[in-house]
């Protein structure tokens, strides 16, 4: 039998690796536009450190054992017929399957706000990160403390928080920080509005410590080449505009994120996993779009696909097998803010060195879990400033090694959570 995994983000890659083990006699096909996996929750780092691209981009052929990788764009999915339509360099093709999972992630939602899509840069792909970096240097050229450049980030979910923090850090590193104003806008009453209040407060404090101007209760109504019209009637000029204001479904789903119940089942043998759908868990709660949710949903989907195919192999007689339900239970949240970080583990909020160690641990742990151990080591070295074993050169924060105790910070923290509010 053939199982198709459409997309290779957090959900797709986790699912494929589990299916390779669970279904050794079945064909597993993963469809991805360019045959790579992007560690999305580290993408903002590329804005400041382009060298990280190699650490957070994985060739699927290097981390998969036997699955077939098809480089194509999924343009349509018929969940009842069991057919996916693909666009390849040779033209349109169809892919029939016995079971499938739609793991296509989400696209940036511009909400049809006039001019926003035309004038803002999103942050979903490597090319976007490079564009944000290039636009930053164009924006700040010639800026002075008396006449500063204004960089506006629209949307203060975790993605917006991270890119705003990174741009503020870039300003400190590459120019006079007084010559750049980084402004983070959020239409709701707090940053990270989907998260607990103590986490929100800590994130806002960290942003302001890093020099970011935070404006909550401020909605964008429209944009043009020179500025934003805000919903309150104010005109806000900008030199650079980045948009992280929300997500929508992938084009293959007509921009929709279908609602699925906790079994993640969309059709007879088609499942939706990760940000491509709106999942209602076993407690009846809507699941937030996040990397950790996508990974955990993939585990449930893998078990359910295995049960359905085993049932068919046994003749398909009698009742269908009982499928597992997904329950969202987050052990905590993490977000980077420039060189700092904020972590929430249970009711406890961590900042400073402990939070950064937790954040780096999560990123490296995820890379190791999908078989990219060398990438994990490189990421830790880059993030924590450990020296390169061959050159002895310090990493990004200039440290030359040591046991991590020289700054009075806490030791390594192991936290099995992911950050990010749009995971792909």
Q: Which sequence ranges carry the predicted segments?
A:
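FAD-binding core/adjacent interface of flavoenzyme oxidoreductases
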Residues: 67-149, 242
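Catalytic nucleophile loop
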Residues: 9-12, 157-160, 294, 301-302
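FAD-site-proximal beta/loop scaffold in flavoenzymes
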Residues: 118-147, 226-227, 235-307
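C-terminal, flexible cofactor-proximal segment of oxidoreductases
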Residues: 23, 297, 302-424
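A Rossmann-like FAD-binding core segment of flavoenzymes
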Residues: 25, 69-80, 95, 172-262
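Beta1-alpha1 glycine-rich phosphate/pyrophosphate-binding loop at the start
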Residues: 1-70, 162-195, 400
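Rossmann-like NAD(P)H-binding beta-loop-alpha module
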Residues: 132-182
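Conserved acidic residues
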Residues: 2, 98, 239
């Amino acid at each position: 039998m053939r199982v198709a995994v459409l997309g290779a983000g957090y959900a797709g890659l986790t699912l494929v690796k589990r299916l390779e083990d669970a279904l050794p006699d079945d064909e597993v096909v993963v469809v991805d536009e360019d045959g790579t996996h992007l560690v999305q929750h580290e993408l903002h780092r590329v804005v400041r450190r382009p060298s990280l691209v190699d650490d957070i981009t994985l060739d699927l052929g290097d981390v998969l054992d036997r699955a077939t990788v098809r480089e194509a764009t999924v343009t349509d999915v018929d969940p009842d017929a069991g057919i996916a339509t693909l666009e390849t360099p040779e033209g349109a093709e169809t892919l029939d399957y016995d079971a499938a999972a739609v793991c296509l992630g989400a696209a940036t939602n511009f909400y049809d706000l006039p001019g926003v899509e035309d004038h803002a840069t999103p942050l979903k792909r490597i090319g976007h990160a490079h564009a944000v970096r290039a636009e930053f240097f164009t924006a700040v050229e010639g800026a002075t403390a008396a006449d500063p450049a204004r960089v506006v980030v629209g949307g203060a979910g975790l993605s917006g928080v991270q890119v705003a923090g990174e741009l503020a850090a870039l300003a400190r590193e590459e120019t006079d920080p007084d010559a750049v104003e980084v402004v983070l806008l959020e239409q709701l009453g707090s940053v990270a509005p989907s998260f607990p209040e103590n986490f929100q407060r800590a994130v806002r404090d960290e942003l302001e410590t890093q020099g970011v101007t935070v404006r909550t209760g401020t909605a964008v109504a429209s944009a043009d080449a020179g500025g934003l019209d805000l919903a309150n009637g104010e005109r806000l000029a900008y030199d650079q505009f980045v948009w992280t204001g929300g997500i929508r479904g992938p084009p293959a789903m007509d921009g929709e994120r279908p609602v699925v119940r906790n079994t993640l089942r969309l059709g007879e043998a088609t499942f939706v996993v990760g940000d491509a759908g709106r999942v209602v868990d076993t407690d009846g709660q809507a699941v937030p779009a996040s990397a950790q949710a996508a990974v955990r949903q993939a585990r449930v989907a893998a078990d359910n696909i295995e049960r359905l195919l085993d049932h068919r192999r046994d003749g398909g007689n009698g009742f269908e097998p009982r499928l597992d339900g997904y329950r969202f239970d987050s052990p905590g949240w993490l977000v980077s803010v420039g060189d700092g970080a904020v972590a929430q583990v249970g009711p406890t909020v961590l900042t400073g060195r402990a939070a950064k160690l937790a954040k780096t641990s999560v990123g490296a742990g995820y890379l190791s879990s999908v078989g990219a151990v060398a990438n994990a080591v490189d990421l830790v070295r880059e993030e924590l400033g450990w020296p390169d074993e061959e050159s002895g050169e310090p990493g990004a924060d200039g440290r030359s090694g040591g046991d991590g105790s020289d700054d009075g910070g806490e030791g390594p923290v192991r936290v099995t959570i992911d950050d990010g509010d749009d995971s792909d």
